[in-house]
Amino acid sequence: TATTTITRYFTKSRGKALSICWFGLSTAEFILPVLIVYLLTITAWQNIWIFISIIILIFLPLTSFFLIKKLDFDTREQVDIDNSEIKEIKQWKRIEVLKDYRFYIICMTMLAMPWIATGSFVYQSFISSSKEWGPYVIAQSFMAYSILSVITLFISGFLIDKFSSRKLLIYMNIPLLFGTIVLYYFDAPLSSFVFFGLVGVTNGLANVLGSSTWAEIYGVKYIGSIKALTTALMVFSTAFGTALFGFLIDIGFSIEQIAVVSGAYIFGSIILLYFVKNKLKPQYL
């Protein structure tokens, strides 16, 4: 909801606004695991959940009230004074988007990160045992993931505002592709930090591009229904990734072979996107 609102009402600084929006989540991914592990040493996990619930009940209504109290948007389409071009862009409905071949090619790129990253997170014990990294290496590697994700968030926001999401989209999964190469070739514990760090770079790019790209191509009038569709596909992709990784492990695939499968998918999606990159433009009325 937050990213959809920002996508709809911001145009000139949409990238920076989305970066700030995602900053909270990425920061929490860095801080909360360490905090929870510490709290588990002094209290039971049930007490931690009660504590979290109390904080949410107290602070969420208060912060929501004060943050939205003085918000004032004129219209959904007229988000900036200099907005004459925005009004001429065709506003695609969801049914029209589903008939556009570009949507499916973009989705192939957008959905690579969710299923590959989720599969890696869920089966981290399999990866760790295959690489003989020890029980804590991957947990420590999440710090590299979070730090690089946050850094990339801010950088991507400025890049999107300068170059547009459509031009940056083709580069989004390249760090993830290099991550699969690292996972295939290297076994040293340091490679865990490099792999998850590269995943974090793609995650930072994907968080911002995942909202702004649709708005640039299909307009903002129906961005809510379009985002609902893409979010549902993302959730399906994470479930698919978990199932696929599990299936491949069950039939005897090594983590190196899974890395090859993942890398082949990423490479294929980049090639497809390359052939249509010049067509990723909005239609003008």
Where are the model-predicted features located?
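Intracellular juxtamembrane helix-capping segments at the cytosolic ends
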Residues: 1-10, 205-218
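Helix-loop-helix hairpin linking two adjacent transmembrane segments in secondary transporters
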Residues: 25-72
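A late C-terminal transmembrane helix in Major Facilitator Superfamily
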Residues: 29, 217-252
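A membrane-interface helix-boundary motif in multi-pass transporters
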Residues: 38-54, 247-265
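Flexible cytoplasmic inter-helical loops of multi-pass small-molecule transporters
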Residues: 68-91, 284-285
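Extracytoplasmic gate region of multi-pass secondary transporters
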Residues: 95-153
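Helix-to-loop junctions at the C-terminal end of transmembrane segments
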Residues: 152-164, 249-250
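Structural signature of the two symmetry-related core transmembrane helices
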Residues: 167-181
